C-alpha cells in the first residue's frame, strides 16, 4: 500500500529551489534510507514531508503530515530540568485529555518505547530502565539524547516516521541496534520509515530501498543492490566508493 505519494514535488526556500519535479512513492511496511551529497536537499525534503515547511510546487498525498508523522531531527538540543520520561511523554500529548494527563496506557507506551531504543526489557523490576527514565535529559551525551528523541517518536505511534541522521551521535553497536529496531517496526507494524543518513554501508545492508539524491540528477529510488550494480553511488558521489 502506497502511503506517501509525491507528484512533481519541488522543495526549497523562497530564494532558492533545492530540488524540483520529484515524483516517487513510499509504501507501508518499508524502511527507506535517503543518501546523497551534502547540500542536495535531504533535510529539506524531510521537513517538507513532515509539514514543517511548504512545498514550492507539486503535491504530497496519502497521509496527513500533522497527524500521521513523527519527526526526529539531527540536532540534539538541551532541554533543561526535564527528565527523560517527560521528553518521551511529549510523544503522547496528542492522545491525552484536555488536562494533559497521561493514562496508564500512555505510561506503558513510554516505558516500552524507551526500552526498545535502549535494548532493555520493559519490566516492573528493571531498575536501570527506571533510573534512566527519571534522569535529567540535559545531563546525557548527544548519543543518549538522540536515542531518547527516537523513543519519543516511537511513543507517538504514527504510521510514518521521518528521521534526519538518527545515528549521527551513536557508536557502531547502537547505530546497528537503532536501524534494526526501525526496520523491525516497518516490517512488523507496517510503518513507513524514511531515514536521511550518511551511513552508506549500513543503508545498503539494512534498507529495503534507497532514495539516492543528487543536485544534478534529482532522485533514484530502488533496492540497494540495483543501485550499486548500476553504478549509481559512484556517479552520485563522484568517486568509486566500493574500492578496497
List each model region and its residues.
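Conserved structural motif at the start of ABC-family nucleotide-binding domains
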Residues: 4, 18-21
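The feature captures the beta-strand-to-loop junction immediately N-terminal to the Walker
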Residues: 35-37
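Helix-to-loop junction immediately C-terminal to a conserved catalytic motif
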Residues: 50
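Conserved ABC ATPase signature
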Residues: 136-140
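Catalytic Walker B motif of ABC-type/P-loop ATPase nucleotide-binding domains
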Residues: 161-164
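H-loop/switch region of ABC-family ATPase nucleotide-binding domains
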Residues: 197-198
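H-loop (His-switch) and adjacent beta-strand-loop-beta switch element
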Residues: 210-223
